[in-house]
Amino acid sequence: RQMCIRDSYDGAHDGYSNLFTWVGLSNFNELISSSSADANLSYTFGEILSWTLMWAFFATFTNYFLGMLVAILINKKGIHFKKLWRGILVLTIAVPQFISLLYVSKLFDTNGVVNAMLLKLGFIDQAIRFWENTTSARILVIVINIWVGIPYLMLVSTGILMNIPQDLYESSKIDGASVWQQYMKITLPYMLFVTGPYLLTQFIGNINNFNVIYLLTSGRPASPDLVTSGGSATTTDLLITWLFNITTGATSNYKPVSYTHLTLPTNSRV
């Protein structure tokens, strides 16, 4: 207690009144203003924020609709071995996600299996740097996330599809409805009604999806334009991975960290 009192009123701390100065919203203005002391901070934040929202959109809705499509195809009348197809897809869920992501990341390395096969077949003359190019890296993380997420969405969609009354489909078929009309008027509205809250939480979860981005890209590709006093960022960084790199980097500049943290929605993700 004596140490706390002494530290609070020593030469570095002139009482409680001078511990800090209120600055209002000036810190947020610095984050979005190009005329701030760290001018590149606002540009870097804007680029990472736009990619984060783009990633969250594609990661959420590609998995949702493709998982639903796979469930519809497996549940379709005339499809044999339905349990087998579901079992094969579920195997990807049984393997821990971080193992799958690290393994697939190595497949697309410069010396990985994918490049080795393309070189051997003569499709390319030199190895493709998948993770060093912004476009290819962003496409890959979205596609690999689809591969990881479709089985789970397939199971969720299967359970919901089995609860849709078949009388609705039979009645609409008698009225002359096409397969597409049945999907748009019966299947999709029912799915959205049941999974609406799930879609919202999934979107927020993908904004904070640290594992997929960090384990796949491992801090690639670097960009000379995304450099701030808090450290450099990559063109595949989400806000959450950028925050992690800033706090664990050599500079440990917590100013952009506090800004970024306040912009992140809170959601638990396994």
Regions from the PLM with identified roles:
Residues 1-2, 6-262, 268-269:
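A structural signal for multi-pass alpha-helical bundles of membrane permease subunits
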